[in-house]
Amino acid sequence: MKLPGKIAIMGGGSWATAIAKMCLAQEDSINWYMRRDDRIADFKRLGHNPAYLTGVKFDTKRISFSSNINDIVKESDTLIFVTPSPYLKAHLKKLKTKIKDKFIITAIKGIVPDDNVIVSEYFTKEYGVPPENIAVLAGPCHAEEVALERLSYLTIACPDKDKARIFARRLGSSFIKTSVSDDVSGIEYSSVLKNVYAIAAGICSGLKYGDNFQAVLISNAIQEMNRFLNTVHPLNRNVDESVYLGDLLVTGYSNFSRNRTFGTMIGKGYSVKSAQIEMEMIAEGYYGTKCIKDINKHHHVNMPILDAVYNILYERISPTIEIKLLTDSFR
Protein backbone atom coordinates (compact mmCIF):
# COMPACT_ATOMS: atom_id res chain seq x y z
CA MET A 1 0.00 0.00 0.00
CA LYS A 2 1.40 3.35 -1.04
CA LEU A 3 0.39 5.99 1.47
CA PRO A 4 -1.53 8.14 1.60
CA GLY A 5 -2.83 7.51 -1.93
CA LYS A 6 -6.25 9.00 -2.58
CA ILE A 7 -7.77 10.42 0.61
CA ALA A 8 -11.48 10.33 1.39
CA ILE A 9 -13.33 12.28 4.06
CA MET A 10 -16.13 10.18 5.55
CA GLY A 11 -18.60 12.58 7.15
CA GLY A 12 -20.08 16.00 6.61
CA GLY A 13 -19.94 17.87 9.92
CA SER A 14 -17.73 20.66 11.22
CA TRP A 15 -14.73 18.46 12.10
CA ALA A 16 -14.96 16.70 8.73
CA THR A 17 -14.99 20.10 7.03
CA ALA A 18 -11.96 21.25 9.01
CA ILE A 19 -10.04 18.08 8.13
CA ALA A 20 -10.93 18.54 4.46
CA LYS A 21 -9.45 22.03 4.65
CA MET A 22 -6.25 20.58 6.15
CA CYS A 23 -5.99 17.89 3.48
CA LEU A 24 -6.53 20.27 0.58
CA ALA A 25 -3.68 22.45 1.82
CA GLN A 26 -1.39 19.71 0.46
CA GLU A 27 -3.45 17.31 -1.67
CA ASP A 28 -4.42 18.14 -5.26
CA SER A 29 -7.84 16.58 -4.75
CA ILE A 30 -9.87 14.49 -2.31
CA ASN A 31 -12.98 12.32 -2.26
CA TRP A 32 -15.76 13.24 0.16
CA TYR A 33 -18.63 11.05 1.37
CA MET A 34 -21.72 12.84 2.65
CA ARG A 35 -24.98 11.13 3.47
CA ARG A 36 -27.34 13.68 1.89
CA ASP A 37 -27.54 14.49 -1.82
CA ASP A 38 -29.19 17.85 -1.14
CA ARG A 39 -26.27 18.85 1.09
CA ILE A 40 -23.82 17.91 -1.65
CA ALA A 41 -25.78 19.91 -4.24
CA ASP A 42 -25.80 22.97 -1.97
CA PHE A 43 -22.07 22.57 -1.28
CA LYS A 44 -21.27 22.54 -5.00
CA ARG A 45 -23.52 25.53 -5.66
CA LEU A 46 -22.27 27.66 -2.76
CA GLY A 47 -18.63 26.59 -2.64
CA HIS A 48 -18.82 25.84 1.09
CA ASN A 49 -20.49 23.42 3.47
CA PRO A 50 -24.04 24.80 3.76
CA ALA A 51 -24.45 23.66 7.35
CA TYR A 52 -21.03 23.73 9.06
CA LEU A 53 -18.09 26.17 9.00
CA THR A 54 -19.83 28.13 6.27
CA GLY A 55 -16.99 30.66 6.15
CA VAL A 56 -14.53 28.08 4.79
CA LYS A 57 -14.45 28.33 1.00
CA PHE A 58 -13.53 25.33 -1.15
CA ASP A 59 -12.57 24.86 -4.77
CA THR A 60 -15.18 22.17 -5.43
CA LYS A 61 -13.42 21.16 -8.66
CA ARG A 62 -10.82 19.54 -6.39
CA ILE A 63 -13.45 17.48 -4.55
CA SER A 64 -15.28 14.36 -5.77
CA PHE A 65 -18.48 14.16 -3.73
CA SER A 66 -20.80 11.18 -3.38
CA SER A 67 -23.59 10.01 -1.10
CA ASN A 68 -22.74 6.41 -2.05
CA ILE A 69 -20.24 5.12 0.48
CA ASN A 70 -19.23 2.20 -1.74
CA ASP A 71 -18.30 4.45 -4.65
CA ILE A 72 -16.10 6.57 -2.38
CA VAL A 73 -14.40 3.55 -0.79
CA LYS A 74 -13.65 1.97 -4.18
CA GLU A 75 -11.95 5.15 -5.39
CA SER A 76 -9.94 5.81 -2.21
CA ASP A 77 -6.88 4.43 -0.43
CA THR A 78 -7.10 6.27 2.89
CA LEU A 79 -10.45 6.72 4.63
CA ILE A 80 -10.71 9.41 7.32
CA PHE A 81 -13.83 8.67 9.38
CA VAL A 82 -15.37 11.75 11.02
CA THR A 83 -18.96 10.65 11.66
CA PRO A 84 -20.41 10.86 15.20
CA SER A 85 -19.86 7.53 16.95
CA PRO A 86 -23.61 6.78 17.43
CA TYR A 87 -24.07 6.82 13.64
CA LEU A 88 -20.92 4.97 12.57
CA LYS A 89 -22.50 1.51 12.40
CA ALA A 90 -25.43 2.79 10.32
CA HIS A 91 -23.02 4.19 7.72
CA LEU A 92 -20.85 1.08 7.68
CA LYS A 93 -23.86 -1.23 7.23
CA LYS A 94 -24.19 0.20 3.71
CA LEU A 95 -20.69 -1.07 2.87
CA LYS A 96 -20.44 -3.80 0.26
CA THR A 97 -16.84 -2.93 -0.58
CA LYS A 98 -14.15 -4.49 1.60
CA ILE A 99 -12.04 -2.04 3.59
CA LYS A 100 -9.48 -4.40 5.12
CA ASP A 101 -6.92 -3.30 2.52
CA LYS A 102 -7.56 0.42 3.09
CA PHE A 103 -5.73 2.67 5.54
CA ILE A 104 -8.19 3.91 8.16
CA ILE A 105 -7.84 7.14 10.13
CA THR A 106 -10.42 7.68 12.83
CA ALA A 107 -11.06 11.25 13.93
CA ILE A 108 -14.13 10.10 15.88
CA LYS A 109 -13.93 11.14 19.52
CA GLY A 110 -16.29 8.50 20.82
CA ILE A 111 -16.90 4.82 21.51
CA VAL A 112 -19.13 2.60 19.37
CA PRO A 113 -22.34 2.42 21.46
CA ASP A 114 -23.67 -1.00 22.51
CA ASP A 115 -20.40 -2.67 21.47
CA ASN A 116 -18.49 -0.50 23.99
CA VAL A 117 -15.29 -0.67 21.97
CA ILE A 118 -13.09 2.15 20.73
CA VAL A 119 -13.36 2.80 17.01
CA SER A 120 -9.94 1.41 16.07
CA GLU A 121 -10.77 -1.92 17.74
CA TYR A 122 -14.15 -1.97 16.01
CA PHE A 123 -12.57 -1.70 12.56
CA THR A 124 -10.20 -4.57 13.37
CA LYS A 125 -12.84 -6.76 14.97
CA GLU A 126 -15.67 -6.25 12.46
CA TYR A 127 -13.84 -5.49 9.21
CA GLY A 128 -10.48 -7.21 9.57
CA VAL A 129 -8.40 -4.05 9.20
CA PRO A 130 -4.92 -4.77 10.65
CA PRO A 131 -4.07 -2.53 13.63
CA GLU A 132 -0.96 -1.25 11.83
CA ASN A 133 -3.27 0.15 9.12
CA ILE A 134 -5.37 2.16 11.56
CA ALA A 135 -4.46 5.58 12.93
CA VAL A 136 -6.15 7.98 15.32
CA LEU A 137 -6.24 11.74 14.81
CA ALA A 138 -6.65 13.73 18.02
CA GLY A 139 -5.53 16.76 19.99
CA PRO A 140 -6.69 20.14 21.32
CA CYS A 141 -8.07 21.30 18.01
CA HIS A 142 -11.53 22.83 17.58
CA ALA A 143 -12.83 22.85 14.03
CA GLU A 144 -13.85 26.49 14.36
CA GLU A 145 -10.25 27.55 14.99
CA VAL A 146 -8.95 25.49 12.08
CA ALA A 147 -11.44 27.39 9.92
CA LEU A 148 -9.87 30.65 11.15
CA GLU A 149 -6.36 29.22 10.58
CA ARG A 150 -5.42 29.73 14.21
CA LEU A 151 -2.37 27.73 15.23
CA SER A 152 -3.40 24.25 16.39
CA TYR A 153 -1.63 21.00 17.32
CA LEU A 154 -2.65 17.49 16.31
CA THR A 155 -1.29 14.03 17.10
CA ILE A 156 -1.48 11.08 14.71
CA ALA A 157 -1.25 7.77 16.58
CA CYS A 158 -0.55 4.46 14.85
CA PRO A 159 1.22 1.24 15.92
CA ASP A 160 3.43 1.82 12.88
CA LYS A 161 4.96 5.22 13.65
CA ASP A 162 6.48 5.47 10.17
CA LYS A 163 2.96 5.49 8.74
CA ALA A 164 1.92 8.03 11.35
CA ARG A 165 4.79 10.28 10.22
CA ILE A 166 3.60 10.13 6.60
CA PHE A 167 0.21 11.50 7.59
CA ALA A 168 1.69 13.97 10.04
CA ARG A 169 3.61 15.52 7.16
CA ARG A 170 0.54 15.56 4.89
CA LEU A 171 -1.71 17.23 7.48
CA GLY A 172 0.81 19.80 8.66
CA SER A 173 0.67 23.39 7.46
CA SER A 174 1.44 26.94 8.57
CA PHE A 175 -1.40 26.68 11.10
CA ILE A 176 -1.34 22.93 11.93
CA LYS A 177 1.60 21.45 13.85
CA THR A 178 1.70 17.66 14.05
CA SER A 179 3.35 14.98 16.16
CA VAL A 180 3.16 11.19 16.23
CA SER A 181 2.50 8.52 18.83
CA ASP A 182 1.89 4.78 19.06
CA ASP A 183 -0.57 5.04 21.97
CA VAL A 184 -3.67 4.40 19.86
CA SER A 185 -5.89 3.00 22.62
CA GLY A 186 -4.81 5.52 25.25
CA ILE A 187 -5.44 8.48 22.96
CA GLU A 188 -8.82 7.13 21.87
CA TYR A 189 -9.95 6.58 25.45
CA SER A 190 -8.68 10.00 26.52
CA SER A 191 -10.62 11.56 23.62
CA VAL A 192 -13.76 9.97 25.00
CA LEU A 193 -13.08 10.84 28.62
CA LYS A 194 -12.31 14.50 27.97
CA ASN A 195 -15.83 14.87 26.57
CA VAL A 196 -17.27 13.40 29.77
CA TYR A 197 -15.22 15.79 31.88
CA ALA A 198 -16.23 18.73 29.66
CA ILE A 199 -19.86 17.89 30.41
CA ALA A 200 -18.97 17.92 34.11
CA ALA A 201 -17.32 21.34 33.68
CA GLY A 202 -20.41 22.61 31.90
CA ILE A 203 -22.74 21.30 34.58
CA CYS A 204 -20.69 23.07 37.23
CA SER A 205 -20.74 26.27 35.18
CA GLY A 206 -24.51 26.01 34.86
CA LEU A 207 -24.71 25.62 38.63
CA LYS A 208 -22.65 28.84 39.03
CA TYR A 209 -19.48 27.24 40.37
CA GLY A 210 -16.56 29.58 39.67
CA ASP A 211 -13.14 29.36 38.07
CA ASN A 212 -11.52 28.27 41.32
CA PHE A 213 -13.64 25.13 41.47
CA GLN A 214 -13.28 24.49 37.74
CA ALA A 215 -9.51 24.32 38.22
CA VAL A 216 -9.94 21.72 40.97
CA LEU A 217 -12.40 19.77 38.82
CA ILE A 218 -10.02 19.58 35.85
CA SER A 219 -7.07 18.72 38.12
CA ASN A 220 -9.05 15.78 39.46
CA ALA A 221 -10.24 14.87 35.97
CA ILE A 222 -6.72 14.38 34.60
CA GLN A 223 -5.88 12.19 37.61
CA GLU A 224 -9.04 10.16 37.01
CA MET A 225 -8.20 9.82 33.32
CA ASN A 226 -4.68 8.65 34.16
CA ARG A 227 -6.00 5.99 36.56
CA PHE A 228 -8.36 4.65 33.91
CA LEU A 229 -5.78 4.63 31.10
CA ASN A 230 -3.17 2.91 33.25
CA THR A 231 -5.70 0.21 34.10
CA VAL A 232 -7.27 -0.53 30.70
CA HIS A 233 -4.11 0.03 28.62
CA PRO A 234 -0.94 0.17 30.76
CA LEU A 235 1.80 2.10 28.98
CA ASN A 236 4.63 4.45 29.82
CA ARG A 237 2.69 7.54 28.69
CA ASN A 238 2.82 11.16 29.84
CA VAL A 239 -0.73 12.47 30.21
CA ASP A 240 0.64 16.01 30.50
CA GLU A 241 1.18 15.98 26.72
CA SER A 242 -1.17 18.09 24.64
CA VAL A 243 -3.05 15.16 23.11
CA TYR A 244 -4.24 14.19 26.61
CA LEU A 245 -4.18 17.17 28.97
CA GLY A 246 -4.34 19.83 26.26
CA ASP A 247 -7.41 18.27 24.67
CA LEU A 248 -9.04 18.00 28.10
CA LEU A 249 -8.35 21.67 28.86
CA VAL A 250 -9.68 23.08 25.60
CA THR A 251 -12.77 20.88 25.67
CA GLY A 252 -13.45 21.70 29.31
CA TYR A 253 -12.99 25.46 29.02
CA SER A 254 -13.72 26.58 25.45
CA ASN A 255 -16.96 28.18 24.31
CA PHE A 256 -16.56 26.15 21.10
CA SER A 257 -16.98 22.91 23.10
CA ARG A 258 -20.35 21.33 22.42
CA ASN A 259 -19.88 18.96 25.38
CA ARG A 260 -19.32 21.86 27.77
CA THR A 261 -22.33 23.64 26.23
CA PHE A 262 -24.45 20.52 26.71
CA GLY A 263 -23.33 20.24 30.34
CA THR A 264 -24.04 23.92 31.00
CA MET A 265 -27.60 23.43 29.80
CA ILE A 266 -28.01 20.42 32.10
CA GLY A 267 -26.66 22.46 35.01
CA LYS A 268 -29.19 25.20 34.26
CA GLY A 269 -32.05 22.73 34.49
CA TYR A 270 -32.56 21.44 30.95
CA SER A 271 -33.50 17.81 30.54
CA VAL A 272 -31.15 15.69 28.44
CA LYS A 273 -33.67 15.53 25.60
CA SER A 274 -34.41 19.26 25.57
CA ALA A 275 -30.68 20.09 25.61
CA GLN A 276 -30.04 17.73 22.69
CA ILE A 277 -32.91 19.21 20.67
CA GLU A 278 -31.82 22.80 21.26
CA MET A 279 -28.16 22.12 20.44
CA GLU A 280 -28.86 20.40 17.09
CA MET A 281 -25.35 18.90 17.32
CA ILE A 282 -24.05 15.69 18.85
CA ALA A 283 -22.42 15.91 22.28
CA GLU A 284 -20.29 12.75 22.11
CA GLY A 285 -19.76 12.80 25.86
CA TYR A 286 -23.38 11.86 26.51
CA TYR A 287 -22.87 8.50 24.81
CA GLY A 288 -19.29 8.17 26.02
CA THR A 289 -20.40 8.48 29.63
CA LYS A 290 -22.50 5.32 29.47
CA CYS A 291 -19.91 3.41 27.45
CA ILE A 292 -17.06 4.17 29.87
CA LYS A 293 -19.34 3.43 32.83
CA ASP A 294 -20.10 -0.01 31.35
CA ILE A 295 -16.44 -0.69 30.52
CA ASN A 296 -15.40 0.30 34.04
CA LYS A 297 -17.68 -2.36 35.53
CA HIS A 298 -14.94 -4.80 34.51
CA HIS A 299 -12.06 -2.69 35.85
CA HIS A 300 -13.41 -1.01 39.01
CA VAL A 301 -11.33 2.15 38.63
CA ASN A 302 -12.18 4.90 41.11
CA MET A 303 -13.92 7.46 38.83
CA PRO A 304 -16.08 9.84 40.91
CA ILE A 305 -16.44 12.46 38.15
CA LEU A 306 -17.59 9.89 35.60
CA ASP A 307 -20.00 8.44 38.17
CA ALA A 308 -21.44 11.87 38.94
CA VAL A 309 -22.02 12.70 35.26
CA TYR A 310 -23.58 9.27 34.70
CA ASN A 311 -25.92 9.69 37.66
CA ILE A 312 -27.04 13.10 36.40
CA LEU A 313 -27.54 12.10 32.76
CA TYR A 314 -28.85 8.55 33.10
CA GLU A 315 -30.19 8.19 36.64
CA ARG A 316 -31.71 11.70 36.61
CA ILE A 317 -30.25 12.61 39.97
CA SER A 318 -30.29 16.34 40.67
CA PRO A 319 -27.11 18.05 39.41
CA THR A 320 -27.08 20.19 42.57
CA ILE A 321 -27.01 17.12 44.81
CA GLU A 322 -24.59 15.10 42.70
CA ILE A 323 -22.03 17.88 42.28
CA LYS A 324 -22.19 18.71 46.00
CA LEU A 325 -21.32 15.08 46.75
CA LEU A 326 -18.50 15.30 44.20
CA THR A 327 -17.02 18.40 45.85
CA ASP A 328 -16.68 16.47 49.09
CA SER A 329 -14.47 13.88 47.37
CA PHE A 330 -12.01 16.43 45.93
CA ARG A 331 -8.76 17.59 47.43
Kindly label every feature range from the protein language model.
Residues 1-56, 63-67:
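NAD(P)+-binding Rossmann beta1-loop-alpha1 motif at the extreme N-terminus of oxidoreductases
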